[in-house]
Amino acid sequence: MSSQYFAEEPGAAHRPGLVHVVLSDVHLALDTDSGVFSPGRLDPGTRLLLDVAPPPPASGDVLDLGCGYGALALVLASRAPAARVWGVDINRRAIALCERNAGRAGLANVRCVAVTGTGPADDRLPGRYDLIWSNPPIRIGKPALHALLAGWLTRLAPAAVAYLVVQRNLGSDSLQRWLENSGWSAARYAARAGYRVLEVGR
């Protein structure tokens, strides 16, 4: 797999595509492109998270960490139209797609924000989140992934939780142990076809 999806400015030539997200309650057609995560299909881990995660809070601030072209963020926004949904990613091409897809879907409660580095220090973003969903960029390596999660999980509001989906053979069990050793409550919430959804809280 190309590492370009976690680059700020992907170097791959543009190859526009379309991915359909068809759930029992939400149908979306999302523009994709080369240089972003899973441009040719809805990633199976993302699909698992969409299928099994409990409903988002009806209001408040909700985060899609590593939003890509916006599949998680737009489903969150569709399911919680009164919530403010934030999609963040380091990849500028992905953020442009997320914005375009939110606009085409008429989801005015989505904000797609390009961030730098691993931390959430950005005055455009809220200080606390009532829910975090993420299919995190495992392939950036453990040190960078741990720094990324350590920075963003601390922004969970009291009693809020995060749902992270990780492929088992890419380290879901070791990530769960790291979270627990770092002082977080981390439990396997669901599993399917080699993917694990972890529920993480304080």
Predicted regions and their residues:
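General small-molecule cofactor/ligand-binding pocket signal
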Residues: 31, 111-113, 187-189
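A short glycine-rich, Lys/Arg-flanked "PGG" loop and its adjoining helix->strand segment in the class I
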Residues: 146-158
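Well-ordered beta-strand scaffold positions
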Residues: 26-28
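Short "lid" loop at the C-terminus of a central beta-strand within the Rossmann-like core
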Residues: 138-140, 167-172
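Conserved beta-strand signature within the Rossmann-like core of class I S-adenosyl-L-methionine
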Residues: 159-166
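Conserved SAM/SAH cofactor-binding pocket of Class I
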Residues: 44-125, 131-134, 145
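N-terminal auxiliary segments of SAM/dcSAM-dependent transferases
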Residues: 1-24, 34-35, 39
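Class I S-adenosyl-L-methionine
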Residues: 3-15, 171-202
